[in-house]
Amino acid sequence: MFARSTTIQADQSSIDAGAAHVRDEVLPALKQLDGLIGLSMMVDRESGRCIATSAWRTEDAMRASADQVQSVRDRAAEILGGSPEVEEWEIVVMHRDHPTHEGACVRTARLQTERGAVDGLIDTYRTASLPQIEGLGGFCSASFMVNRASGRAVSSTCFENSAAMDASREQAERIRSAGTQQANASVLDVSEFELAVAHLRVPELV
């Protein structure tokens, strides 16, 4: 399975309108495309950073959707008041403990490793990091995506609410530090978001 993420530095006053547009207009439009699994959107109201991610059954389906998605993406970016930055990923891990509800939050970590070391990073996340992440209070789900060409990866952990995410911060840092050290990877940034749209629907993959 594959994913396309669109990051927009939004006008903070436009975030609610943008999230509503993604939920009410973008999602129904994308559902008409072959191979779509689902869509999610995360927002950071303090910084204005928003990330929408569409998931696809195959890389071919993701690539085939590019032209049709562009106009939809550009309209969403216009409403949010920012320019879209697009990245493509392979979804290599998806694990859910239970569904998310209103108020759910997500912590993401962007990682970098050598292109030839991506499989080792995936294995470390799957066998060493994920079992510990599952033990965090308020844990809902976790995913891991990679771009093999660039050596980039993104881990995402979803929590029931902001209080659970806040309480997990120090323990999550220890897990992340141990995992990246073991895999010889570096952390590019760590961000925390509100889960504004939750319709990703990616099947279990561990």
Where are these regions (language model features)?
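Short S/T/G/P-rich N-terminal loop/turn motif that feeds into the first structured element of a domain
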Residues: 1-51, 57-206
